[in-house]
Regions:
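Sec-dependent N-terminal signal peptides
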Residues: 4-13
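Alpha-helix termination/capping residues and helix-transition junctions
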Residues: 11, 83, 184-186
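Sec/Tat signal peptide C-region and signal peptidase I cleavage site
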Residues: 15-19
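Serine-hydrolase catalytic machinery in alpha/beta-hydrolase-like enzymes
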Residues: 22-40, 50, 54-57, 62-159
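Extracellular/cell-surface secretome signature
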Residues: 43-44
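Primarily recognizes the serine-hydrolase "nucleophile elbow" in alpha/beta-hydrolase
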Residues: 154-190
Length: 190
């Protein structure tokens, strides 16, 4: 248990230090949804185009769907714990969408926690994945905050009422990691 907590602290500290550099102002108010960044040429240009990569999970990760609180199901990439567990790590994508790089990160985090935590990389763009900065900006700008909250709440319901949830994300996902901790209320552990 100490190893899991230590790993989460290291990962969260690292991600928070990065997220402070590019996306710190987006969630300064309850209305911030990061779309303001999509018109900032420096912000857009600071994102390197992801290298081509096709992920094949070695730990059993697979795409799933789950019910949300609106009419459209949510999607995610799930790596189930080796043992029955109510411990969950929600992984939030950066502005590119739930691409194969995020799936790889989910697998890495799963392995770092000894395979004893359910890891769910949540698709915040309903299946859209950007390969250009322009598409990434468009997807982030058009992301509807209510829909995103419905996706998070659907993921929480999928995890179950007894789930203890930690979260991590990068840039866009870092903001949603924070928001999901707020939405998770007593289920949030980090």
């Amino acid at each position: 248990m100490k190893k899991i907590i230590l790993t989460l602290l290291v990962v969260l500290t690292t991600s928070l230090s990065y997220s402070q550099s590019c996306c710190q102002l987006a969630f300064a108010s309850n209305e911030g949804n990061m779309s303001e960044f999509t018109t900032d040429e420096n912000f857009v240009a600071s994102h390197q185009i992801p290298l081509e990569y096709n992920h094949n999970s070695l730990v059993g990760g697979e795409m799933i769907t789950f019910k949300t609180t609106d009419v459209t199901d949510g999607n995610g990439y799930l790596v189930k714990s080796k043992i029955k567990s109510n411990k969950w790590l929600f992984v939030y994508q950066e502005w590119w969408g739930l691409n194969d790089h995020i799936k790889k990160q989910a697998d890495i985090l799963y392995n770092e926690m000894g395979g004893n935590v359910n890891v769910l990389a949540i698709d915040m763009y309903d299946g859209k994945v950007a390969t250009t900065r322009e598409d990434a900006a468009k997807y982030m700008q058009s992301a509807d905050e209510k829909r995103l909250e419905n996706i998070v709440n659907g993921a929480l319901a999928y995890a179950g009422k007894k789930a203890k949830v930690a979260s991590i994300g990068w840039c866009f996902g870092g903001g949603w990691s924070l928001k999901s901790a707020i939405l998770s209320k007593k289920q949030a552990i980090g």
